[in-house]
Amino acid sequence: MAQTEAMAEIKQQALVDINEAQNEKALQDVKVKYLGKKGSVTGLMKHMKDLPNEEKPAYGQQVNEVRQTIEKEIQARHELLGNEQLEQQLKEEKIDVTLPSRKIAIGAKHPLTRTIEEIEDLFLGLGYEIVDGFEVEQDYYNFEALNLPKSHPARDMQDSFYITDEILMRTHTSPVQARTMEKRNGEGPVKILCPGKVYRRDSDDATHSHQFTQIEGLVVDENIKMSDLKGTLELLAKQLFGEDREIRLRPSYFPFTEPSVEVDVSCFKCKGEGCNVCKHTGWIEILGAGMVHPNVLEMAGFDSNKYTGFAFGMGPDRIAMLKYGIEDIRHFYTNDVRFLSQFKAVEDRGEK
């Protein structure tokens, strides 16, 4: 009887102590006091040896019930203290959602990206397919398939980064055209645009870089004429530099086209009167083009008596420099935020 009363007193006092615990440390102390190895509830079990055998099961069950009650109350108090602590923390860290937020710095498209996408959008609208290719290319596709055999003197026009005797960093995106035509097994039409990085052994200066971007276009079909090329280039010039632009074709030489032309656009700054941009000529050179050489068609498996085509190639770097008044090509590749941030204002105004 005395042990039962002691058990009830321990239980009652434990519940009082649990409710008075104001923090996790105090609650842990209560747990040790009653449920630890030397705790009060643990001590009750030591008296079991003094009881008759028939009373031991009932007594043990009562002690376990007291232990379970205390454990349950400790857990409940633990959760309550945790909620109170969280509530207090939220009050202390309360955020005034009515305060104006900090503006997130927003970037803008790189001027080269803007120029490339503008050109791609135009030709996608004309039904061209955008095709990518290898930057590490075979000598055959970079030169021989484009009417530049190993003995051709025009190879001296392009100093190249060779990796092996037959592998090099491509010097133009024309290999994409050669590979695409080859895959068509002599069946037209072919209508592709090939943007990408190219590499040449140039000394870096304001107008030259060992790595730069290039976009080339190719159309192969029956009855393709020089007038088709001219109309396409006129549309490109107006898209890039304004509706009042005119183009001029000058005879030139490229091994992979015949006839070949250099393409000039009327100066968008002085309207043809002469200025520092056009070097007082009224015209600005923007790209090279021509009719696809019959040898190139034949090497790709096309019948040059049935199919004709035109090709053109331009440097988005140069076009972007002209459009945005940039005097040094190296600005495109140095990642200077001061330079790049200027184009955020251009983008905000919705300008191309």
From Swiss-Prot:
Free-text comment on the cofactor: Binds 2 magnesium ions per tetramer.
Names of the cofactor(s): Mg(2+)
One of the GO BP terms on file: phenylalanyl-tRNA aminoacylation
EC number: 6.1.1.20
Protein biosynthesis as UniProt keyword: yes
Keyword list, A-Z: Aminoacyl-tRNA synthetase, ATP-binding, Cytoplasm, Ligase, Magnesium, Metal-binding, Nucleotide-binding, Protein biosynthesis
InterPro entries from the UniProt entry: aa-tRNA-synth_II (IPR006195), aa-tRNA-synth_II/BPL/LPL (IPR045864), Phe-tRNA-synth_IIc_asu (IPR004529), Phe-tRNA_ligase_II_N (IPR004188), Phe_tRNA_ligase_alpha1_bac (IPR022911), Phenylalanyl-tRNA_Synthase (IPR002319), tRNA-bd_arm (IPR010978)
Top-rank taxon: Bacteria
Catalytic activity as recorded in UniProt: tRNA(Phe) + L-phenylalanine + ATP = L-phenylalanyl-tRNA(Phe) + AMP + diphosphate + H(+)
GO cellular component: cytoplasm
Subcellular location: Cytoplasm
A molecular function GO annotation: tRNA binding
Binding site for Mg(2+): E258
Enzyme class: ligase
Family: Belongs to the class-II aminoacyl-tRNA synthetase family. Phe-tRNA synthetase alpha subunit type 1 subfamily.
NCBIfam families named among the record's database cross-references: pheS (TIGR00468)
Subunit structure: Tetramer of two alpha and two beta subunits.
Name assigned to this protein: Phenylalanine--tRNA ligase alpha subunit
Gene name in the database record: pheS
